[in-house]
């Protein structure tokens, strides 16, 4: 039987009767991706909420991990593997943002709202020849300035 052992302010911690971290994905239904990468970082003893410095050792590590995951996405051989690699890429992306104290959940909400403003003057999407949705005249860039640490 699973018991709830403790609750931290940066996500949910579920443990089994022996005190092992739960590996059942259903244990994390109430957690956001940010909650989960913060939990991972805490348990794996990898510090978060650092000041961002471009080309610092931690920045280079996070970029290498993103590149590794992207390469694995490109090399995926079937649908299930592709989905797994896309999830890994998203997870590492959330971990990268959390490393520097950035709330990627909120950034994605704002980028989504911005993307929804890409309609043309007639209220319909405008497409490039390859199918990419272009920015219409009503496009509003997201304001993320309050989400980044100075």
Where are these regions (language model features)?
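Flexible "arm" and connector segments at domain edges
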Residues: 4-86, 90-150
């Amino acid at each position: 039987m699973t018991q709830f052992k403790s609750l931290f302010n940066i996500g949910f911690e579920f443990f089994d009767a022996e005190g092992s971290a739960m590996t059942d994905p259903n244990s994390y239904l109430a957690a956001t991706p940010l909650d989960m990468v913060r939990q991972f970082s805490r348990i794996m003893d990898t510090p978060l909420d650092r000041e961002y410095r471009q080309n610092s050792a931690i920045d280079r590590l996070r970029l290498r991990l993103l590149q590794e995951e992207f390469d694995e996405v490109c090399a995926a051989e079937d649908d299930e593997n592709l989905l797994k690699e896309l999830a890994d890429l998203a997870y590492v992306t959330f971990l990268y943002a959390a490393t520097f104290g950035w709330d990627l959940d909120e950034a994605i909400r704002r980028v989504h709202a911005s993307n929804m403003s890409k309609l043309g003057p007639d209220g319909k999407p405008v497409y490039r020849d390859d199918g990419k949705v272009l920015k219409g005249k009503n496009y509003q860039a997201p304001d993320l300035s309050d989400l980044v640490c100075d």
